[in-house]
Amino acid sequence: MKLETKCHGIIEYKEEDVIEFKKGIPGFNELKRFINFPIEDNEVFSVLHSIENNEIGFIVTSPFSIIKDYEINLDDSVIERLNIENEKDVLVLNTVTLHSKLENITVNLCAPIVINIKTKLGEQIILNNGKYQIKHPLFKEGI
């Protein structure tokens, strides 16, 4: 199948690549089906893109590339909704907010996107532990 995206051109994918967000993503509750694909020549970022709206995609990254000891504790209800049986089947991503100035690019560490790569079910959860920032700077000034 092909998805013609606004910013990334035509992306080919298979039905088994589709990740279902039964609750949608906050702010985009009506969009339930997404694919995650790498950004060309970039190992840090990828795109989580709606296949229902070719204009909606999010730049995402692994929180572990930013904070090595990043941790989340999933409620039993999330584990059940995503049918998680093994933590090795879990992919955690965080949304990135782009800006023209490098030092203003941020990542939302408070609301990780949790994906069961085995069942292709996903959900964005909110961490209320006060440990992480919504707008965590991705780059330090002067880099």
UniProtKB/Swiss-Prot annotation:
Classification via InterPro entries: Flagellar_assembly_factor_FliW, Flagellar_assmbl_FliW_dom_sf
One GO process term, biological-process aspect: regulation of translation
Pfam families: FliW
Subunit-level organization: Interacts with translational regulator CsrA and flagellin(s).
UniProt keyword Metal-binding, yes or no: no
Function: Acts as an anti-CsrA protein, binds CsrA and prevents it from repressing translation of its target genes, one of which is flagellin. Binds to flagellin and participates in the assembly of the flagellum.
Domain of life, source organism: Bacteria
Similarity comment text for this entry: Belongs to the FliW family.
Entry keyword set: Bacterial flagellum biogenesis, Chaperone, Cytoplasm, Translation regulation
Intracellular or extracellular location(s): Cytoplasm
Protein name according to UniProt: Flagellar assembly factor FliW
GO cellular component, one term: cytoplasm
